[in-house]
């Protein structure tokens, strides 16, 4: 009998949500996602120390500006970790643009192009890279421009249907609805602490996005993310992709049994609607208090971890 991780692979592409090379070797995912929090955790792994030292040395050769050294070393480290991961997987690595740039279209595009250039210098083609951007209006517009340059994007911190719709209309390659954080909010802000699968707001959110995309013929990939437990994951079997932490990959691999495909579209295609304007996007997004709170919170958390990472680098630059 297959374990549930093997069974799940029948319906969804499995992506590892980690920067830990040993975990990637163990679970053999198709793709891998990283973010500032995961890169920060990776700096605590002894096997990465040579990459950190190399990034610092490289940054010092690029300019005489100490502040720029910090930025360059942080970018270089994220890319070098990505390069090591790509040696172990057949697919793509997602590397994130600094969350502090989430509301700056031009700066986000520049940072993305810098990351792609660093990968190119390491002989990694852009087809193996997804640039991660927060799904703000500005992040979506930056992704739209990057996609036209052949740079594929992963729009993250996605909580509202307005975000999902705007991403599809911009032609982005992939979105990452944050499943677990949706439930966190509802548990905190309602009297209901446990939800049946048919009433679960996290499951309903991804189901709505998935079926909307398929119904209107959008090619944007839906990748469920930020899971809290294996039950959440199994409720979305059939989602295009699922990015899963090593701990939950381990749990799935230890569970024996079959998996039922929960997401499948069999309806007729419908015409795409007129794209949202900026004002329509903000109006619709702001009707969802969970999405407003969680998007802002997520950007702050990633920005905080990015600063912690820069501080780690600064100590080595001193």
Curated annotation (Swiss-Prot):
GO terms for biological process: carbohydrate metabolic process; pentose-phosphate shunt. SUPFAM superfamilies: Aldolase. It is an enzyme of class 2 (transferase). Keywords: Cytoplasm, Pentose shunt, Schiff base, Transferase. The keyword Transferase applies. Pathway: Carbohydrate degradation; pentose phosphate pathway; D-glyceraldehyde 3-phosphate and beta-D-fructose 6-phosphate from D-ribose 5-phosphate and D-xylulose 5-phosphate (non-oxidative stage): step 2/3. The active site is at 132 (schiff-base intermediate with substrate). Disulfide bonds: none annotated. It catalyses: D-sedoheptulose 7-phosphate + D-glyceraldehyde 3-phosphate = D-erythrose 4-phosphate + beta-D-fructose 6-phosphate. It holds the Pfam family TAL_FSA. The keyword Transferase applies. Transaldolase is important for the balance of metabolites in the pentose-phosphate pathway. Belongs to the transaldolase family. Type 1 subfamily. This is Transaldolase.
């Amino acid at each position: 009998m297959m374990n549930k991780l093997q069974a799940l692979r029948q319906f969804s592409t499995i992506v590892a949500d980690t920067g830990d090379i040993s975990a990637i070797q163990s679970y053999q995912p198709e793709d891998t996602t990283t973010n500032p929090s995961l890169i920060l955790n990776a700096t605590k792994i002894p096997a990465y120390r040579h990459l950190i030292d190399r990034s610092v040395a490289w940054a010092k050769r690029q300019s005489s500006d100490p502040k720029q050294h910090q930025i360059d070393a942080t970018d270089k480290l994220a890319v070098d970790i990505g390069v090591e991961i790509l040696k172990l997987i057949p697919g793509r690595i997602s590397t994130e643009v600094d969350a502090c740039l989430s509301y700056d279209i031009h700066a986000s595009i520049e940072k993305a192009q810098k990351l792609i250039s660093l990968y190119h210098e390491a002989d990694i083609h852009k087809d193996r890279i997804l640039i991660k951007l927060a799904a703000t209006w500005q992040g979506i517009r930056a992704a739209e421009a990057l996609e036209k340059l052949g740079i594929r994007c992963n729009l993250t911190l996605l909580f509202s249907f307005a975000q999902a719709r705007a991403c599809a209309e911009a032609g982005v390659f992939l979105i990452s609805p944050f499943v677990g954080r949706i439930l966190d909010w509802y548990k905190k802000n309602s009297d209901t602490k446990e939800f049946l699968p048919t009433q679960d707001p996290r499951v309903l959110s991804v189901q709505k996005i998935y079926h909307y995309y398929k119904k209107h013929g959008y090619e944007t990939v839906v990748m469920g993310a930020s899971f809290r437990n294996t039950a959440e994951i199994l409720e979305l079997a059939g989602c295009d992709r699922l990015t899963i932490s090593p701990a939950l990959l381990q749990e799935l691999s230890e569970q024996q049994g079959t998996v039922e495909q929960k997401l499948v579209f069999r309806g007729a295609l419908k015409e795409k609607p007129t794209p949202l304007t900026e004002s329509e996007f903000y109006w619709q997004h702001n009707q969802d208090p969970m999405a407003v709170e969680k998007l802002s919170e997520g950007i702050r958390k990633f920005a905080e971890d990015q600063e912690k990472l820069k501080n780690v680098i600064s100590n080595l630059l001193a």
